Amino acid sequence: MDYKKIIKDNYTLHLIKTDRFKTINIGLKLTKEYNKEEFAYLNLLARVLPINGTKNYKTVNDITKKLESLYNTGIYFKSLQTSKNMSFEASLRIVNPKYTEKSMYKESISMLKEIITNPLIKNNEFNYFDVTKNNLINNIKNIKDNFFKI
């Protein structure tokens, strides 16, 4: 296993090279000081991006079909909070290109980039923003309602 840490002005890149696995995980983590209101938006962003569609893949079905054509590549988003920081994570799980076509690696990274940088936006909003916001509010209410029943 080879480990390399590259520190730049605005980011730190961690590279771990190993040939023990048949899948490759690539992650992007953006971290900043915790802010309650911004964290709510980060949480919504992590929930909206995978289902929203993009300029080139208009529906979640289009995204799913493309990911399946890339040997069921997985793309995941989440928001995390610690006492002082909050972060947004995007990760990609792909089959090691040595077992597939060489172009698959580049196509998978392009798909992650497409979802992050080209979301489908109409009237200055994500397609599923209101639905996702209401689902999140209901989840929070359910946690509060069920907390005392445990």
Language model segments and positions:
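Short N-terminal helix-initiation segments at or just after the protein's N-terminus
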Residues: 26-37, 55, 130-142
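A general boundary/transition motif marking the beginning of the first structured unit of a protein
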Residues: 55, 99-100, 124, 143
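Catalytic Zn2+-binding segment of zinc metalloproteases
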Residues: 50-57
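A generic local secondary-structure boundary/capping motif
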Residues: 3, 143-144
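Acidic/histidine-enriched alpha-helical segments
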Residues: 60, 64, 115-141
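M16 family metallopeptidases and their MPP-like homologs
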Residues: 16, 22-42, 60-114, 145-150
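N- or domain-start disorder-to-order transition segments that initiate the globular core
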Residues: 1-25
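Active-site His/Glu-centered metal-binding helix of metallohydrolases
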Residues: 45
